[in-house]
């Protein structure tokens, strides 16, 4: 009797590791945003270190215009509240993560009340710090822009000068085989990026720095 051979699922970490054109730190090469998370809890100490990393991000005039709301599965009601701030498509997979966070940005400088044009940029820097710290601890972070800002404002009493801008699912990567087919395919697809020649210019818009000899 012949036994059917089941297809094997490639290890996401192997598939997802970047193939950079030039050397980069391994934390950047190994970082990626999974859709699948295990139910393993994130320790309080690890979670604290992630937000400590965010704390030390650079920002314009040291304004630090970011605020985060965080919820873990240890507090089901809080977790459900934060989950409800995501669009339906993101709720479907993010609900498996052990930790969810909401990134809020303040659009005004605290002292002058003037618009802070760097605010969203700086929130991104804080979250990037968090992501790299998470990667160093064997954790993964999937950032989302698909959320419901008005829902978040109401549930968390976010003031008028601030806005829920992004959400983060944090945890340990799960085997992609346990995901719905469409998400499994995404978790198993190689990471792709435009070459630097397409976004690093010199002299004028569209003039590649690599072609001009500024970069290799």
Question: What residues fall within each predicted segment?
Answer:
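Acidic, surface-exposed loops and disordered segments
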Residues: 1-216
